[in-house]
Regions:
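Beta-strand-rich globular domains of non-transmembrane regions
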Residues: 3, 7-94
């Protein structure tokens, strides 16, 4: 599961350790955008990312009525060459 929220001053994502095809990943194998690490975690339950929109290579798109923040969630296995990505987006009103 993935939960995403944002505002003009922060981007928040909470993920479960099995978000990538039920492969269990450790907190140090999950990254936001340009390799920003997990900022808080409860082992085996969830991992959180909490960053400013200017960090981690988060892209900001200004649309007519809303602001769109775009980034990605990355899995980089420590024990193999397995890599995976999921795009993340969040919208808020101007």
């Amino acid at each position: 599961a993935i939960f995403v929220r944002c505002s003009s001053s922060w981007f928040f994502a909470r993920i479960t350790p099995t978000v990538f095809y039920n492969v269990h990943m450790n907190h140090d194998e999950a990254f936001l955008g340009n390799n920003c690490p997990v900022t808080y975690f409860v082992p085996n339950y969830y991992y959180e990312f909490f960053y400013r929109p200017q960090a981690c290579g988060i892209k900001v798109e200004i649309l007519q009525e809303v602001i769109l923040l775009k980034t990605k969630l990355k899995y980089v296995s420590r024990n193999s060459t397995v890599r995976a990505e999921i795009p993340l987006m969040c919208v808020f009103r101007k």
